[in-house]
């Protein structure tokens, strides 16, 4: 027997069975697709889900095993590796010559005798006075010397007398530390030759030899206690259900207007306020003007421009620079002689002439030839008149009234709105059977005659 519940009988998506929260007393394999989300957000039959942008699995992997040879193994072969030859340094040989203790200063320094420099400042008075000046300074006139004995000097007497012989430039360090030749030491460093050992490596270690295996104890597995359901029946009563009782009220009335409006039978007026106030003006018919046929000139086209006709090549010389010559300030030589001036004489300062580029462009005396590539290869052609594919103008539009009919008004067929069978207290054509463990109110279909009569009920039946 095909039984249906309110969820299956509803055609508007607003009615469903009062589902219970849990079902622990009945074990059924039939899944229940009802949830809080499907209750609040019903599915729309007119909505089509969009296509997935996930790429399709068009590529199929070949079952042939992959070759172990790579590009590097195929293109690059093996080479015979030769051991690296290490360079052995040469033995150091001591120099037999004696070391000279001359410094860079003694080698490059040249002694120059010093001469007295003549005074640079001229004398104030050219005529010298030979008379002696007789005057006493203020210090000598005011301060007279005391008659005291001169104190003896505390400075020790100078007992050092420099030797008359020549200084031999020997130091204490040179006397105490003589020069020693380098000693050849024997190197105990092993040579860098490769050591190739053919003896295989022993895998036996001290850990393997001294390890003693002990038997493992069996692990104790704890079994979990089996679930025992409570004998007290579940009343499914919550604080919310206990405090707030639902009252049976009248069904909500729909505010949707009736589809058959009385004003839809009147034809739509095509005349508007704009058409009544602004009438079309009588415009005269436009006569198209005949185009004048193009007549090409008989002579050839003169390609000579105004610049080519009037320009003449001037055979002139480029202009010279008007920049004044910079005069160097020359002064008299300084009348003095120093060691630096005697060693470093003045250089002959000669003025360098400016570097002028050579004129590479040479203007010819012959007149300019105005023959170009366009003139040499240009062939005049007659212009081709293209045919216009633009449709002809049919004149001003005639005032034709607008048709009030549309495609929707001609092809629309009104249909009868049927009431949802789940909105009745008892669905017509079905008899209540039972309520299952989940909370679905199951109905079985009645006889065929009763179901046919109930299907023809209109929208106004209550």
Curated annotation (Swiss-Prot):
Keywords, sorted A to Z: Cell projection, Cilium biogenesis/degradation, Cytoplasm, Cytoskeleton, Repeat
Residue ranges, annotated region (Mn 1): 30-64
Region (Mn 2), start-end ranges: 65-97
Region ranges (Mn 5): 166-199
One term of GO molecular function: microtubule binding
Protein origin, superkingdom: Eukaryota
Region feature (Mn 9): 300-332
Pfam family, one: SAXO1-2
Positions of region (Mn 10): 333-366
Keyword Repeat: yes
InterPro entries: SAXO1/2
GO biological process: cell projection organization; cellular response to cold; cold acclimation; positive regulation of cilium assembly; protein stabilization
Region (Mn 6): 200-232
Region: Mn 7, residue numbers: 233-266
Transmembrane spans: none
Entry GO terms, CC: axonemal microtubule; centriole; centrosome; ciliary basal body; cytoskeleton; motile cilium; sperm flagellum
Region feature Mn 3, mapped onto this chain: 98-131
Subcellular location: Cytoplasm, Cytoskeleton, Microtubule organizing center, Centrosome, Centriole; Cytoplasm, Cytoskeleton, Cilium basal body; Cytoplasm, Cytoskeleton, Cilium axoneme; Cytoplasm, Cytoskeleton, Microtubule organizing center, Centrosome
Domain comment, as recorded: The Mn regions are involved in microtubule-binding and stabilization at low temperature. They are required and sufficient for cilium targeting. The N-terminal region (residues 1-29) might play a role in centriole retention.
Function as written in the Swiss-Prot or TrEMBL entry: May play a role in the regulation of cilium length. Stabilizes microtubules at low temperature.
Entry protein name: Stabilizer of axonemal microtubules 1
Taxonomic source organism: Rattus norvegicus (Rat)
């Amino acid at each position: 027997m095909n039984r249906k519940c309110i969820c299956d009988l509803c055609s508007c998506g607003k009615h469903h069975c009062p589902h219970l929260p849990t079902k622990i007393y009945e074990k059924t394999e039939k899944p229940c697709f009802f949830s809080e989300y499907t209750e609040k957000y019903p599915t729309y039959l007119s909505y089509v889900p969009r296509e997935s942008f996930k790429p399709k699995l068009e590529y199929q992997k070949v079952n042939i095993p992959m070759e172990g040879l790579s590009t590097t193994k195929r293109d690059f072969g093996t080479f015979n590796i030769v051991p690296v030859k290490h360079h052995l340094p040469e033995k150091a040989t001591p120099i037999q010559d004696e070391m000279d203790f001359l410094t860079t200063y003694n080698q490059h320094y040249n002694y120059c005798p010093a001469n007295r420099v003549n005074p640079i400042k001229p004398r104030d008075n050219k005529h010298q006075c030979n008379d002696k000046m007789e005057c006493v300074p203020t210090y000598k006139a005011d301060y007279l010397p005391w008659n005291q004995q001169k104190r003896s000097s505390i400075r020790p007497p100078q007992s050092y007398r420099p030797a008359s012989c020549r200084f031999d430039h020997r130091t204490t360090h040179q006397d105490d530390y003589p020069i020693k030749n380098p000693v050849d030491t024997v190197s105990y460093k092993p040579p860098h030759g490769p050591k190739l050992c053919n003896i295989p490596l022993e895998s036996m270690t001290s850990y393997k030899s001294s390890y003693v295996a002990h038997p493992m104890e069996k692990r104790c597995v704890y079994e979990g206690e089996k679930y025992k359901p409570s004998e007290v029946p579940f009343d499914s009563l919550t604080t919310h259900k206990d405090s707030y009782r639902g009252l049976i009220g009248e069904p909500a009335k729909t505010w949707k207007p009736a589809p058959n409006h009385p004003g839809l039978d009147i034809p739509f007026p095509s005349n508007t306020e704009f058409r009544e106030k602004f009438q079309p003006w009588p415009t005269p018919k436009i006569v198209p003007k005949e185009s004048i046929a193009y007549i090409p000139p008989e002579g050839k086209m003169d390609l000579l421009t105004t610049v080519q006709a009037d320009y003449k090549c001037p055979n002139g010389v480029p202009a010279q620079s008007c920049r004044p010559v910079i005069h160097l300030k020359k002064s008299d030589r300084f009348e003095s002689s120093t060691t630096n001036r005697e060693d470093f004489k003045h250089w002959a300062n000669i003025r360098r002439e400016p570097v002028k580029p050579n004129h590479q462009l040479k203007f010819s005396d012959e007149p300019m030839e105005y023959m170009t590539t366009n003139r040499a290869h240009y062939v005049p052609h007659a212009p081709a008149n293209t045919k216009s594919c633009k449709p002809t103008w049919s004149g001003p539009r005639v005032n034709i009234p607008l048709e009030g009919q549309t495609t929707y008004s001609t092809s629309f067929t009104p249909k009868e709105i049927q009431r949802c069978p789940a909105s009745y207290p008892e669905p017509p054509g079905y008899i209540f059977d039972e309520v299952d463990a989940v909370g679905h109110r199951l109905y079985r279909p009645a006889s065929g005659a009763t179901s046919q009569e109930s299907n023809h009920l209109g929208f106004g039946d209550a």
